[in-house]
C-alpha cells in the first residue's frame, strides 16, 4: 500500500474525476460519500453492516466524542477504530460546526471558541491546539482544522474578519500537527461565505499553509441551491487538483452530483441516516415516504433493484408497519437501505466518470430527484 496521503488521479470526465486516496487504514476510491457516525456509531448500524454496504470511510464527531466518553478514554482504550470496532478509514471533523451551532452558548476569541456543553452546561475551550490534540487522541485517519463556519447572511465585514481568524487558526493547527505525523492526514478548510473574492482569498491563504487535502466549508447553511452551485462552481477549481477536495455537510443526491461535476471528491451529510429515521427513503425509482397510507397493503419490496437486507427480505407494508409502530428495527432497516442507496449511487457515478458518461448519469438521477428533493 502507498504511504498515507498518496492521492492518485484516475480517469475523469469534464471536471468530474476519479481518484484513490491512501490512508493508514486503507485506500478510498473517490468520489466518495462518508456516512456520519457522530458518537462513534452510525446510528442503528454495526460496523459489519457498514462493510456489507461497502462504506469506504466514515465520519466521527470531535465535539461529541470529546464530551462523551472523552478523547483521553478513547485513546486509553486503543483509539477510535478499536473502540468502535471499525478497521476502515475514519475522518473526524474539528467540532467547530457543532460549537458554532450552539449560538448563544459560545464565544469566539483569537484563542479559540468557548462554549457550554449541551449535556451538562460545563464550560470548555476549543482552541486550534485543543482540537488537534483531541483528534490525535481519537486516532482518526483524517483530521480537520478548527474554522469558523460563518452563518448564511453574514455581511462582508464580518465574513472577511472571520476568514482571517480561520486562516490563523489553520496555521496553528498545522503547527500542532506536522505533516506526516503518526500517519494522520490533516485537511484545511476554505471559508469566505458567499463572496467570491473572499473565497479566492481564503483558498490562497489555506493552500499556502499546506495540507493533505482541502475542504469547502460554509455551504448548505440555508442558501438556495442556485447560490450554493454558483459558489461551488467558482471555489472548487481554486483547490489544488493534486489533492483531495471535500465538500462538507452536503448530501442530497442532486447536490452530490453537482459537487462531482465541479470536481469534488469527498462528501458527508446526516441526510440519509436522519431521513431514514424520519421514514424518508431513497430508491432508484425516486423518493419514498414509507409512512404514507398507500403503502399499508403494498407487498412489493421497497426497491426491487436494491441488494440491501431490507429490500431482499421485507415488503413496503412491513416497513411501514415498523415505522408507524415506532419499532427500533425500523430505524435499522431504513438506515441500512438509505446508505446502501448512497453507496451504489456513488459507485455508479465513479463508473460513469471512468466511462465518460457522467453527464448522462447526472441527468438520469436528477430526473428521479427533482429540485427540492
UniProtKB/Swiss-Prot annotation:
Q: Which domain of life is it from?
A: Bacteria
**Ligand binding (Zn(2+)):** 306, 308, 311, 337
Q: Which Pfam families match?
A: TGT (PF01702)
Region of interest called RNA binding, as start-end residue ranges on this chain: 249-255, 273-277
Identify the InterPro entries for this entry: ArchSynthase1/Queuine_TRR, TGT, TGT-like_sf, tRNA_ribo_trans-like
The residues the record assigns to binding substrate are 93-97, 147, 191, 218
Q: Which residues cross the membrane?
A: none
Please give the GO cellular component terms listed in this UniProt entry. Answer: cytosol
Tell me which SUPFAM superfamilies the record gives. tRNA-guanine transglycosylase
Q: Which residues form the active site?
A: 93, 268
**How is the quaternary structure described?**
Homodimer. Within each dimer, one monomer is responsible for RNA recognition and catalysis, while the other monomer binds to the replacement base PreQ1.
**Which protein family is named in the record?**
Belongs to the queuine tRNA-ribosyltransferase family.
- HAMAP family per the record? Q_tRNA_Tgt (MF_00168)
Question: What's the name of the protein?
Answer: Queuine tRNA-ribosyltransferase
Source organism: Solidesulfovibrio magneticus (strain ATCC 700980 / DSM 13731 / RS-1) (Desulfovibrio magneticus)
